[in-house]
């Protein structure tokens, strides 16, 4: 089964995935219409800064077993047997945050949601864009990612590709393959900026 796979070494922190995610979860599924919606749609993928300010797109891994599901006291969090996606029923969520405390990745957020009763704050996380994939589209975050940091693929195929990259790297005794030149240059500049900042502070 396909899923969104994260390649953090390719992330440039542009946050287009966050914008696309919010728009995809708007009632009208349109960025421009989303601005006028109440409650305003929020992204379910979040880009944070890692080492050397490297971007990291953090999203739900739909763990199996899922710690959030096991911690949910009301049974609001469940796994869809057809898609293997961990979902949240907003009608049953009581905003207790037990799921957030159990999640090892910190991906749950709490805010008003279009699918929830008006004015109710509920737990929200990635739903693998199930509505989009049911129509034959790929998840919004992977669709807009131009660097390959987020790809929609079979896990086995993605792992085989990683193995090939490692094998090529070892056999050629060079740096990792598959990072676009512009991304590699961007990462080099980020590292130089961090080093320069440290030198100035001394």
Regions found by a protein language model. Give the residues of each.
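Non-ligating segments of multi-cofactor redox enzymes
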Residues: 1-202
